[in-house]
Amino acid sequence: MPATRSEVIELLSAMVEIDSVTPWLIPDGAGEGRVAQYIADWLTAADIGAEIEIVEVEPGRPNLLARLRGTGGGPTLCVNAHTDTVGFANWPDTALVPRIDGDLMYGLGVADDKSGCAAGMLVLRSLASSGARLRGDLLVACVADEEGISIGSEHLARYPGIDAAIVIEPQPTDMLVVEHQGFGWIDVITHGVAAHGSAPEEGVDAIVHLAEVISRLHRLDREVFTRNPSAMNGRTVFHTGTVSGGTDYATYPNRATLGIEIGTQPGEHLNDRVAEIEAIFTEIAETEPGFRGEVSVRLDRDPFLAQGHERLQEALVASMTDVLGRPPTVTGLNAWTDAALMQAAGIPTLLIGANGGNFHAPDEWLSLSEFMKLCTILEQTAVSFLS
């Protein structure tokens, strides 16, 4: 039986009220333990016969796995959503206080991505209560650390016997994502020579050299990335994130560091971006005596490109068309999701979600009516794919 609006609000409210900030981003973040236990308790109380397992990927960092077994002989479909959130320093008083205004529900993680976990939970309950006889298994995986370095989905991707996956992230409900960008977090470092501020003939200013690198990186963004966008994923992501350098006012800085996020399109690798940065170093060294630069990769995530997904896509398109009254828009994203990790493990994967907004910002919101459509789409897809 599909959930009512009041049941949806009750479930999402309870999940929003649980602090599950990823400690990878915020060192004293609460982590995912309490929300994973809440999901396990909710499913146990629902008495639907699901096999429930809490798997600690790292101490205090669990994945919650719930399997509704079919009659046998069918595939296993995994619904993947994440339990962790970013921090809420910008709205400490209201982030964990769910609020309803018409069709919109507000709160940290209500869209990104506790809505995905809740959708999986409600679909498990609905399928069990409907008495539908499915040959295959539905596995709902509420994973840790997507907002960090995705240790949860990296662990899940090694889980045996998953034949296809639907990753849920907030997005327009009529979007069916079949590819998206990868990204890298990179430190761009320039090295100078420390010297007394009154001895320019002895010092080499690492900050001045880094400023030249920044200028040329933005030129690369304007003249290459912006002018040559991907038809599916938009322009390649680039932005500066952090900058540091120097020791005091009176000394030439011997080191300066720029932290950037930079994207890759399907068919590209982060090594392509590193080569572009190193080419900038070569150009600068031709005119700046003493210039020395290096690149240090902090995190490298490959792009996502769905493969072997035709049967799953057929089921999703049929369900989305039925629920929405029109075919979905098959497209890409300029963001990154755990779909890339599932597909990289050889699991045919697609990405859907429900309308929301203000992700990683105050007053994050979710459309309740669109969320309920997502639940129906998931249930119909599971019935079709697993039968």
PLM features: what roles do these ranges have?
Residues 103-119, 196:
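Glycine/serine-rich anion-binding loops at beta->alpha junctions
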Residues 80-81, 141-143, 166-169, 189-191, ...:
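Short beta-strand segments
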Residues 91, 101-103, 123-139, 217-227, ...:
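Phosphate-handling active-site elements
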Residues 2-108, 129-134, 385:
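Acidic/His- and Gly-rich active-site-bordering loop/insert found
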Residues 113-185, 386-387:
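Acidic/histidine-rich catalytic neighborhood of metal-dependent amide-processing enzymes
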Residues 2-3, 34, 53, 178-179, ...:
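Metal-dependent amide/peptide-bond hydrolase catalytic core
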